[in-house]
């Protein structure tokens, strides 16, 4: 491979566990670093950076959360009300500040409400509404050396951006070098009709800058049926510059179980280790073949 892809884990799957404890567990499992939930108010960037670096890790990205945890905190870049759109821009800017403070590379953005497949006006009107807010956020990100990556989410959970090609079409309309796209394998296996590897190759190195990883069952990679060898080979073929951030859940568990602390630490860590080892071994196999 052109380089070894690094592997991270998104800290939302740990629920309310304190960050120092999460970092200790992530380091013990063997990850290269972490992706932080995009809640800038709960972090001290200087303290986070020190905790992470002391463990020999790094922060790869910030996971934008749309909406926020409080009622009315929509963070909605496609809202028909300009004041609400501005609140969304301000939120993304706060995530950019966090990313810059902890040394992260990118901030994930979703231009619609996760968990709400309905549109507010119409799909076209909502897409039109988010162009200028995304451009404002991208300009700010560029000033701080941070990429914004639009995440497509399956049609049962959002109303606007479903596929990688949807995300690229939107990014092209925004027309700023700091707005790119990413993919989440759990959502991609629903929306990418000819397969995840083909979607990655079509996107190419420039656009495709980050990946979330979980198997088709939302368990750790290797515990389901997704073609991980082909997925990693596609990333190699486009000379992927980003990282892979795992966010799996044990079978039968939901994000709400993670939020509420209903996933035993031993089970979660064991499955994260299975997934990480599987991806690393698969990457090594590909490297041995192509070198």
For every predicted segment, state its role.
Residues 40-60, 89-103, 131-139, 196-202, ...:
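Short amphipathic alpha-helices and their capping/turn segments at secondary-structure boundaries
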Residues 22-42:
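Basic, amphipathic N-terminal segments that precede the first structured/catalytic domain
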Residues 1-11, 65-79, 111-118:
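N-terminal small/glycine-rich loop or linker at the start of catalytic domains
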Residues 13-15, 19, 40, 65-68, ...:
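Active-site-proximal loop/turn and secondary-structure-junction residues that shape catalytic pockets
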Residues 1-7, 15-27, 103, 161-183, ...:
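Histidine-acidic metal/acid-base catalytic patches
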Residues 78-180, 190, 266-271, 289-290:
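Active-site acidic/histidine proton-transfer and metal-coordination neighborhood
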Residues 35-55, 111-122:
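Glycine-rich, proline-tolerant flexible connector loops at the mouths of alpha/beta enzymes
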Residues 35, 61-63, 108, 149, ...:
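Conserved beta-strand positions in the central sheet of alpha/beta enzyme cores
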């Amino acid at each position: 491979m052109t380089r070894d892809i690094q592997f991270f884990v998104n800290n939302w799957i740990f629920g309310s566990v304190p960050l120092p404890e999460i970092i200790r567990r992530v380091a013990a499992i063997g990850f290269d670093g972490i992706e932080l939930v995009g809640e800038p108010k709960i972090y001290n960037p200087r303290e986070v950076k020190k905790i992470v670096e002391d463990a020999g890790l790094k922060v790869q990205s910030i996971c934008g959360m749309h909406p926020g945890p409080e009622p009315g905190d929509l963070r909605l870049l496609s809202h028909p009300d300009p004041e609400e759109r501005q609140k969304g821009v301000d939120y993304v800017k706060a995530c950019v500040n966090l990313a810059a403070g902890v040394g992260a590379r990118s901030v994930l953005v979703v231009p619609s409400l996760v968990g709400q497949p309905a549109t507010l006006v119409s799909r076209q009107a909502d897409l039109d509404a988010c162009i200028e807010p995304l451009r404002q956020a991208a300009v700010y990100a560029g000033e701080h050396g941070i990429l914004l990556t639009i995440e497509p989410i399956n049609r049962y959970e959002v109303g606007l951006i479903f596929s990688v090609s949807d995300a690229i079409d939107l990014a092209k309309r925004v027309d700023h070098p700091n707005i790119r796209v990413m993919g989440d394998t759990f959502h991609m296996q629903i929306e990418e009709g000819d397969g995840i590897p083909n979607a990655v190759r079509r996107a190419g190195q420039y656009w495709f800058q980050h990946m979330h990883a979980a198997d088709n069952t939302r368990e750790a990679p290797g515990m389901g049926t997704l073609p991980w060898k082909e997925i990693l080979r596609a990333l190699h073929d486009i000379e992927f510059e980003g990282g892979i951030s795992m966010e799996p859940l044990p079978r039968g568990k939901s994000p709400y179980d993670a939020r509420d602390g209903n996933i035993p630490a031993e089970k979660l860590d064991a499955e994260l280790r299975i997934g990480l080892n599987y991806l690393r071994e698969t990457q090594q196999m590909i490297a041995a073949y192509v070198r």
